[in-house]
Swiss-Prot record:
Transmembrane annotation, as ranges: 40-59, 65-82, 99-115, 126-151, 158-183, 187-212, 226-257, 262-283, 287-300, 308-339, 345-374, 381-411, 416-446, 633-653, 658-684, 692-716, 725-751
Similarity comment: family membership: Belongs to the monovalent cation:proton antiporter 1 (CPA1) transporter (TC 2.A.36) family.
Protein name according to UniProt: Solute carrier family 9 member C1
GO CC term, one of those recorded: motile cilium
Chain intervals for the UniProt region annotation (Disordered): 1137-1175
Lineage of the organism: Eukaryota, Metazoa, Chordata, Craniata, Vertebrata
Gene Ontology MF terms: monoatomic ion channel activity; sodium:proton antiporter activity
Coiled-coil zones: none
């Protein structure tokens, strides 16, 4: 018993010791923290705080922020020798390994810079950047290496010199981009500098890593130097580039289903980037080159709207933190005793290196300037000079210098390591200080600031217009009763902003004048080349903003917005050229390869069910016909072809061919016999029709070549026992062609894939054209702000209208050829618009406190789930047919009785291409609903919105489209049938048009007897369309969909009589739109003609025609209750204008009724409060 107890105790104690050992191991691995962790956290927080403070307050300081941070780090390192407490904090940083230092900060900085590049301009400048960064980089690198070895001050070997040359040639793309951002350089020059700086830094990092890798491989693998260089270049450049493209596609596909700024996905993609970097480094590729490739091919349109903004801010924040850490830590990582050994010769050597780099870089640019200037985009010696002085050295140079100084490569003594690090960092500091002073002066002296006098004046007047709008808004707020006792003098002084583009009186009154070459007459205003170029740039900027806005609203796809923005950006720097539908067509042309492949498959592969032919009367031929056209016979042929591939493959392998020579011959005889038998059976079954099929003749030709091969072998004309001759190779290739027969099996699937791909290309082209048309319509709304003078406005207006007409015609032809594509695109677009509006409603409810944050989050999840379902929506939706046409008419869709009535006498009318549906001046015959096709509406002369507007009116006057194209689903003749006026335009069919015709007599029969509300619905539909367009011109583009729909929910139609005045605006009315006829402002005596948004300053109008209608938009009920329930300011109750209400003046209401109404509302509010309290 005692022995058992002792053994049990020993076992228990042993298990306890094992448990304690595992616990200690887990604690040491997972729960241990370095003793200096608090010091590290304090230093990092202090660096971020100081760096952010200096960046905010020392932007214009002569000494750059990186130099200040470096000096702070140096001071901290020197003070660490004087104080033990400071030494503790310095040691917390100096333990960091250079590889960790490089791997933490460099990847995020390089990726962020690449991601922020303008990929469209880089594509345009591709050849210039390629010439600069490949031959130019190699020449510059060779010259730097030659200079360092010639001077040989540091007495290094070949490998350290190669690495130190890479340190000196590199540049910092982030600091370079920041240095030229506010200098006013042209867009082409700015992107050329940024692209060259990024690729130079990446190539220098690749060369540094490659040299280290080659040196490491030389110790372990015995290969020639050329083999090592080629294999390293292949893995570090080619493989890294391919990997970057693959990961780009994977990230785009992954992020395609992410909507909104989901923090989990943002964190995950950040982690994925570092994972990609370290995986590439582990497998022998360049992680930096891979990340730069991913950053260049990813851009803001690679992600769903709402994601890219958060990502960009997140990466900018990380890049800035990395920038602060690098320049502060490097001051700490240079040993303090290095400064004690600094002599004048060391400083002179650093200055010598700096000026030598400048001279060599300028020499390289001047040598390549003839080639660069011939590549276009205005390259000159001035550009070369600016590119030389704009180069900033920073993070890549410091990281490589740190790696070189602390690497295992033999550099001699510790002092030589410190000298390498000192000279590498000192050249960066000198570059940052000197170039900061010289670069702005060089830009000014060389006249490269892209700020012309016309542009300067335009910006001045734009700022002045902005100031006037601010003051006018303040004037309107003075009438608000809640702000009556505010100190408006202080408000007026507070909103006065100093114009940064102020000019003297002479510059303001000066007008650039040009003389006419014919009459030598001075032309006033600024209608010259400079003004037109400025207008073109603003136009392109407005178009790009419209395309990006459509993408954020999910109207445009990612690929479509990339093409549109790229096309617009490619014309930003081309003088005298502008974007047009022809240019868009070049970008959006579908690939013709798919059409060729589809025709090839359809022509080569015959359909057995269709080509059976007529069986012969003879028994033998009839039996052959039955055998040939069975599935068993066909699939037996496929099986034999598959079996014959193995001997054919063996024929190409010399060793196996010698071993199985007899077997291959026997197999060849058997297979050839089967092919001959198959051909004879097909000839007997199909007879003459056999020779009308290309594929059968092709197979017969291959069989005859096989027979010829057998004859040549048997007669010893050729032999397969020796090396392959041309004849043998030809015979083997002909045999392999028989494998193409297998394509007949997969042809249906291939055709489905090709058809789907072609459908995607057509959808892509449709999206581009529609986005372009919407962009031109958005430009029309702000054309007054774009044009700098009346003449440029007229030129721009004609151009925009012409381009929009051309694009609409192309869109119409595309929709006519592929109606299912148009229906699918419109359906998906409308679903996305509605879901976005639902999200805006949830956002508005949350801001007002109607729903809680948790409830809003749950609703948003449901909306996001629906948006993901839209991605999986069927690719093709068939257009509606004639039976469904009445259900798609807005004023019939919810009334089954009206639909039944309309269908009684409505009919389908088809017009040939070129026929007129009606001509201008004809009496209206009825309403035409376009089922399919395209109709061109044209007026005999341009029709202005306002023909009788007084001269002192300041209302915009834009000509309506002289020519317009209507597509399927649109309705013609509604307004003329309602007013019984003659047609104001001609309707011509540009294609075969199928319409759903409703006679006017039948329509009025419905108005009077069966469906009296139908007339009001038609006016409502017309009024909403006009009102939406007019209100859109005065709403913010960002959220106009939600605001507009919110406003149109409270709209109704009202007639304006000709014989009496009508009050329109009161506190319950937000907008009044004149949708038909004309009216006169009773106070200002201005005449407004439809369509027109009547200004708020107009309180009474009177009709000028027998038939005048307005659309009135009221505030929501909740807003009116809020306004009326203010006890201190109880306004007089006013009757809003309802469609059927009697006219009553706002001033004739009795005061007692006002008090009664106020008391009644107050009582209702008190009861409501009591009910809420009880609940």
């Amino acid at each position: 018993m005692e022995m058992e107890e002792i053994s049990e105790n020993l076992t228990a104690s042993h298990s306890i010791k094992l448990t304690n050992m595992w616990l200690e191991l887990l604690k040491s691995v997972f729960l241990s923290t370095p003793q200096d962790l608090p010091e590290i956290i304090l230093i990092l927080s202090l660096i971020c705080t100081v760096g952010a403070f200096l960046n905010m307050h020392l932007k214009d300081f002569p000494i750059p922020l990186p130099v200040i941070l470096f000096l702070i780090g140096c001071c901290f390192e020197i003070l660490s020798f004087a104080s033990t407490q400071i030494q503790i904090y310095a040691d917390a940083i100096q333990w960091m390994d250079p590889d960790i230092f490089f791997g933490i900060f460099t990847p995020v900085i390089i990726f962020n810079v690449a991601f922020d590049m303008d990929i469209y301009m880089l594509q345009k400048l591709f050849w210039q950047i390629l010439v600069i960064t490949i031959p130019g980089f190699l020449i510059n690198y060779t010259l730097i290496l030659w200079y360092l070895q010639s001077v040989n001050k540091l007495s290094l070997k070949t490998v350290p010199w190669l690495l130190f040359s890479a340190v000196l040639i590199s540049s910092d793309p982030m600091l370079t981009s920041a240095s030229i951002r506010d200098l006013g350089l042209s867009r082409s020059l700015t992107n050329l500098i940024n692209g060259e700086s990024l690729l130079t830094s990446v190539l220098s990092l690749v060369i540094y890593s490659g040299v280290v890798h080659i040196r490491f491989k030389s110790k372990s693998v015995n290969h020639t130097l050329a083999h090592k260089v080629m294999s390293t270049a292949w893995s570090y450049i080619v493989e890294s580039f391919i990997t970057g493209i693959v990961f780009t596609k994977v990230i785009q596909l992954w992020m395609a289903t992410i909507f909104g700024d989901d923090v989990n996905h943002i964190t995950l993609i950040f982690s994925v980037l570092y994972l990609i970097f370290y995986v590439c480094e582990l497998v022998g590729m360049s992680g930096i080159f891979t990340l730069a490739t991913i950053g260049l091919f990813l851009n803001s349109t690679s992600f769903k709207p709402g994601v890219e903004a958060f990502l960009l801010e997140f990466w900018n924040c990380l890049s800035f933190i990395g920038f602060l850490m690098v320049f502060t830590f490097i001051g700490l990582l240079i040993p303090a005793h290095t400064y004690l050994h600094i002599s004048f010769s060391d400083v002179y050597y650093s200055l010598n290196i700096y000026f030598t780099l400048i001279v060599l870089r300028l020499l390289v640019f001047l040598l390549m300037s003839p080639i660069l200037s011939r590549l276009g985009h205005g390259f000159s010696w001035r550009w070369a000079f600016i590119m030389v002085w704009s180069e900033m050295k920073g993070t890549p140079n410091i990281n490589m210098a740190l790696l070189l100084a602390y690497s295992d490569i033999s550099l001699g003594s510790e002092r030589e390591r410190s000298q390498i690090l000192f000279h590498g960092v000192s050249v960066c500091v000198i570059t940052l200080i000197v170039n900061r002073f010289i670069l702005p002066m060089a830009v000014t002296k060389l006249g490269l600031r892209d700020v012309t006098s016309t542009k300067y004046k335009s910006v001045y007047y734009t700022f002045q217009h902005f100031q006037e709008l601010t003051k006018s808004t303040a004037m309107a707020l003075k009438f608000d009763k809640d702000l009556a006792n505010a100190d408006w003098n202080m408000v007026d002084n507070a909103i006065i902003l100093q114009n940064p583009y102020a000019m003297n009186q002479e510059e303001i009154t000066e007008h650039q004048k040009v003389k006419c070459p014919d009459c030598n007459k001075e032309i006033d205003e600024t209608l010259n080349i400079e003004a037109m170029e400025l207008t073109n740039r603003r136009l392109l900027s407005a178009q790009i903003a419209s395309y990006q806005r459509q993408y954020r609203n999910e109207v445009l796809s990612q690929s479509a917005v990339q093409v549109l923005v790229g096309a617009a950006g490619s014309f930003g720097e081309k003088k005298g050229e502008y974007m047009s539908p022809e240019n868009i067509k070049n970008f959006s042309e579908s690939k013709k390869l798919l059409s060729f492949l589809r025709k090839l498959l359809l022509n080569w592969v015959y359909n057995t069910k269709k080509d059976k032919g007529v069986p012969s009367r003879y028994m033998f031929l009839h039996a052959c016909h039955r055998i040939v056209f069975t599935n068993e016979f066909e699939y037996t042929g496929y099986l034999v072809v598959l079996m014959s591939t193995y001997p054919m493959i063996i024929c190409w392998i010399s060793r196996l061919k010698d071993i199985y020579d007899n077997e291959i011959k026997c197999a060849n005889y058997y297979f050839l016999a089967f092919y001959i038998l198959e051909a004879l059976l097909k000839v007997a079954a199909m007879r003459k029709e056999f020779f009308s099929h290309t594929w059968l003749l092709f197979e017969l030709g291959i069989t005859l070549v096989g027979v010829l091969d057998i004859i040549l072998i048997e007669t010893d004309s050729i032999s397969y026992n020796f090396d392959l001759t041309e004849t043998v190779v030809f015979m083997n290739v002909i045999r392999l062609l028989r494998i193409l027969r297998i394509l007949k099996l997969v042809t249906p699937k291939l055709l489905q894939i090709i058809d789907k791909r072609m459908s995607q290309q057509i959808s892509f082209r449709y999206s581009i054209l529609k986005g372009y048309v919407q962009g031109e319509m958005d430009v029309l709304n702000i054309i007054d702000q774009i044009a700098s003078s009346k003449q440029t406005k007229q030129i721009l207006l004609k151009r925009v209208m012409r381009n929009m007409e051309h694009a609409m015609k192309e869109l119409g032809y595309l929709e006519y050829d592929h109606p299912e594509i148009a229906v699918t695109m419109k359906t998906k677009e409308e679903i996305n618009v509605m879901l976005n509006m639902a999200r805006e409603i949830v956002k508005a409810f949350r801001s007002k406190g109607i729903i809680h944050k948790v409830e809003g989050t749950e609703i948003n999840k449901l909306i996001m789930a629906k948006k993901i379902q839209v991605l999986d929506l069927q690719s093709v939706i068939q257009p509606f047919n004639v039976e469904e046409a009445p259900c798609n008419i807005p004023w019939l869709s919810e009334d089954p009785e009206a639909i039944t009535f309309i269908q009684e006498k409505a009919k389908v009318v088809t017009f040939d291409c070129g026929n007129n549906i009606f001509e201008e001046g004809d009496e209206p015959e009825g309403i035409y609903v376009i089922i399919s096709g395209m109709v061109k509406l044209k007026r005999s002369k341009p029709h202005l919105e306002m023909e009788r507007v007084s001269a002192e009116s300041e209302i915009k006057i834009h000509p309506l489209p002289h020519t317009e194209y209507l597509l399927s689903g649109e309705i013609i003749g509604e307004l003329n049938c309602l007013t019984k006026e003659r047609m104001q335009y001609s309707a011509t069919c540009k294609t075969v048009v199928e319409t759903y015709f409703i006679p006017i007599s039948h329509l009025y029969e419905g108005f009077e007897k069966r469906c009296p509300n139908m007339k009001h619905k038609m006016w409502q539909k017309i009024g909403l369309a006009i009102t939406a367009q007019k209100i859109r011109e005065h709403l913010s583009f960002e959220d106009w969909n939600y605001k507009l729909q919110l406003k149109l929910c409270n709209a109704f139609i009202r007639d304006i009589p000709k014989s009496m005045k009508t009050d329109i605006y009161d506190e319950t009315v937000t907008h009044v739109v004149l949708i038909h006829g004309s009216a006169e402002d009773c106070q200002l005596r201005k005449i407004y003609k439809a369509p027109f948004l009547i200004p708020v300053t107009c309180h009474q109008i009177q009709g000028m025609e027998d038939f005048t209608k307005v659309m009135i938009i009221q505030t929501s009920i909740a807003v009116r209750k809020f306004r009326w329930n203010v006890r201190k300011y109880i306004p007089p109750r006013r009757i809003s204008m309802k469609p059927d209400s009697e006219r009553e003046s706002f001033e004739t209401l009795d005061e007692t009724s006002e008090e009664d109404n106020g008391k009644k509302e107050n009582q209702e509010n008190e009861e409501l409060i009591e009910e809420n309290i009880n609940i």
